Structures are given as structure tokens and as C-alpha cells.
């Protein structure tokens, strides 16, 4: 019996998942991203260094039988990429991509998987919005290469706006958490009441009430907020990224500056990619801090941005070409002399190179599922014909 949130990926779905993994990683490699493959397990002091409480809860812990130290089974590959960059990235721009299994203690959502196949890309060492634009472009190039019938909708946010307002208002940690909870619940009436007694409360309410209208948001904020360089820059970055998406990819874009689910991890632009009417995002991405390789002891950050997705979520939205499944005539195969058998094996090798799936039967009853063709002997020649 399998636990809840854990399932076998079988047959054609398993084949499709492997094709998708290979195709998407090759797309990333051709865009200049270096493929890395971190291990499934690490000591928790490195795997969970700086991790959010949510990630810590999602991580299975085990005892290393060699050392007695606590190890974690990765629930997210991104922290491992931070470690790799800290030791190998240097001070310049570095691009990484990856694809691997992760394991969660709890499913995300009611029917979520606890064993996603996580694929992603990261850029380290670039503060410019050009890095975020590049990642978005790479993401759409990947999705378009799959020829999906589903349409990708992007929801943009920027944690700097709320974070900076909280600093200007000198909010306590409890007030900050309360506002974030009200934003998450979309509870405008209660939010309005709470904001009436908060410093710069009108600004916090404005984020929820008018934050989707990014072109006019700055003008609705207080003069103090309007004059803050970080807030002005954040709004400008959102406008530029939205315009780029609409012009370059003609996709639907929405803005939600109160999307703060990664508040304690992200440091700037955040984005979620949704397909069709699904409520859980297919892709999550945004800005975060890495660590400079020569400054680990001083804990100084290295700018980074990235995205990740669960490849298995694509299975329902993609189709592969129908396979050609070939069976060799059992009786004819077993009556061949050595020379004839060698000629047959050469033809079988040629068919397999062309993508045919050729089964050499072990018995007369040995027949593959989904048979489309037979290879039969006629007039001393092996002929392929549809069934």
C-alpha cells in the first residue's frame, strides 16, 4: 500500500514524464544553464540553513547510520543550488538548471503529490531586472516547446513594496503577520478596520484594494511612500515585466502585490504561472538571496532569481506522438537459420533507431500492449505491416 499523496507513475505516463524531463532540461542547457544533480540527502545544517519553517516541516529527517548526525531528505532542490553556487559560483553571473525527485512530509493542497519531480532554473550574481526577464523568457520557451493546449497565465508580485512599507511604519512582527494573514484571506472588511489603527494604515489597505492596478498604484499611496526609492523601483519593475510579458508572449498577466506566501524567503519580484483554471500554480519563481562564496562567514547575500515546477503536473496537458509497437512473428522467428537471424537483428536495430518499439517474443502468447505493427517473413523478406 502506498501512503496518501504517493503514487506510481506507470507505462505511458512514465515514458512521457521522462521525455518531458529530458526535453525541458535540454531547453535550459541550450539557453546556457549548467545542469547540476545534487544528492537526495544532506546533513540538515546545510540542507536547512536559512530555510523557512514551512520547508523545515516539509522535510523528512533521518539519522545517518555512519555518523549519528541528523540528515534531511530534500523537499526542495533550490537550497542545494545555493550551496553549490556558494562553493562553485564565484562572484560573476552563474546559471544553473536541475531536475530531480523531492519528497514532502505533507501534500500541497487536497490532492497534491508528496513526491514531485522538481525541475527549475536559477541565475545568481545579477541584480538587474534583466535576469528576471531572461528567466521568464526561458520559461515561456520551454512551455511553447511542448505544444501544450493549455494556456499559461502569470501572476506577478513584489514583496519589497509591503516589506518597505512595514519598515517605514515600524510595524511590529505581530502586526506584520496579521496583515499578511488578512491579505492571504482576502478579508477586506477586517483589513480596513485593522489598518485604521496602524501607522500608514491607508497604504496597507491600498495594496489590497488597488494593488492590481499597478499603473496607478504609486499615485494612490501616501506621499511618504511615493518618495521612497525602493517602493518606486519595485513598482517600476512590475510595470516593465508586465509590459514585456504582454508584448513578447501575448499572455494574460495579473498583479497581486499582496502575494506574500514567500515573504520570509523572497526579496523582490515573485511570480506564479497557472494553466487553465487550476488553482495551484504550475510554476513558482522569484528573487531570493544566495551566499557569496568568499563571504560565508559574514553572511553577505548574493542576488539570485529562479523558478521551479513539478514536471508530473504537465502530464495531463501534453501529448506525445503515438508509439509504433512492433511484434516479430514468433513461429517465423524460431525457424530461422543463423544467417537469416542476423539479417533480422539488423532490421530490428534499424527500426529501433527510428523510434519503433520492437518486441522479440519469448512465447507464442507473448504480445505487447498496444500493438500497432507486425514484422513477418514473406518471400524471404521481413515486412512491416500495420495490424
From Swiss-Prot:
Family, as annotated: Belongs to the class-II aminoacyl-tRNA synthetase family. HisZ subfamily.
Function: Required for the first step of histidine biosynthesis. May allow the feedback regulation of ATP phosphoribosyltransferase activity by histidine.
UniProt-listed Gene3D superfamilies: Bira Bifunctional Protein, Domain 2
Location of the protein in the cell: Cytoplasm
Additional remark text: This function is generally fulfilled by the C-terminal part of HisG, which is missing in some bacteria such as this one.
Gene coding for it: hisZ
Assembly information from the UniProt record: Heteromultimer composed of HisG and HisZ subunits.
Keywords: Amino-acid biosynthesis, Cytoplasm, Histidine biosynthesis
Pathway: Amino-acid biosynthesis; L-histidine biosynthesis; L-histidine from 5-phospho-alpha-D-ribose 1-diphosphate: step 1/9
Pfam families (UniProt xref): tRNA-synt_His
GO biological process: histidyl-tRNA aminoacylation; L-histidine biosynthetic process
Protein name: ATP phosphoribosyltransferase regulatory subunit
A GO term for molecular function: histidine-tRNA ligase activity
Signal peptide region: none
GO CC annotations, alphabetized: cytoplasm
Xref: InterPro entries: aa-tRNA-synth_II/BPL/LPL (IPR045864), HisRS-like_core (IPR041715), HisRS/HisZ (IPR004516), HisZ (IPR004517)
